[in-house]
Amino acid sequence: MLKPFYARRGLPGLVPALAPSAEQWQSLFTLYIIAAVIVGGAVFVMFFYFLAKYRRKPGTAEPKDAPRVGVMEERGNPALAAILTALLVSLFFGLTLNTFALNAFLQNPPNDPNALYVDVIGFQWGWRFVYPNARELIGELRVPVLNSTCTPAVRGCWSGTVVLNITSADVFHSFGIALLKIKRDAIPGRINQAWFVAEKVDIYPEAIRCYELCGTGHALMIADLLVLSADNFHDWYLTGP
């Protein structure tokens, strides 16, 4: 998989991230902000420079290349225009390449044999979460925190990677966790995948929401995210279904 430039360089995000997905998203957002500040700053500097340099002064004649009615004279510097165009194209190409790399990172779950797979079913108006042991929760998603001691050689443990198989039981919905920077459409008859790794044990009330207008109860289509320690999640999981 292509690793984004900002990930290779460890570009920090503007705010602390709660998961690798959020960290990658924040890093790309920071990259866009830096590019926007540089380009915008350069434009404003040139704007005020030319405004001061070429302002009309009393007693000075109009320049020969000033615009006039009729045939335009040759103006400007084609070489400079070509250089600026090449720089802008390179900038936009780099941003686009990193955006596609981030999409690939978010849309393709890692090959983790110890990942937890959860079926997510949207309905009017709520979320149902079905675990591999057939246990179901409505309005609450429980996941294990990142467990660095869980390796592929260790069976019966969860690494912390959570893969969500998202669908809908009725109309179109859109499953999203803003804190983790993940969002996928929930479409009847189709399964879309999302994944994340939570790095901090905590309770995030109403962190899960529907991001597509789906009826009169759309605003109430929320769910809590509970990130449990490895032991607590294991104990809870074994009590199901």
Q: PLM features: what roles do these ranges have?
A:
Residues W25, F29-A42:
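Alpha-helical transmembrane segments
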Residues I38-M46, L87-G94:
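Residue-level signal for the membrane-embedded core of alpha-helical transmembrane segments
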Residues L2-F29, L51-P241:
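Non-transmembrane, membrane-proximal soluble domains of secreted or membrane proteins
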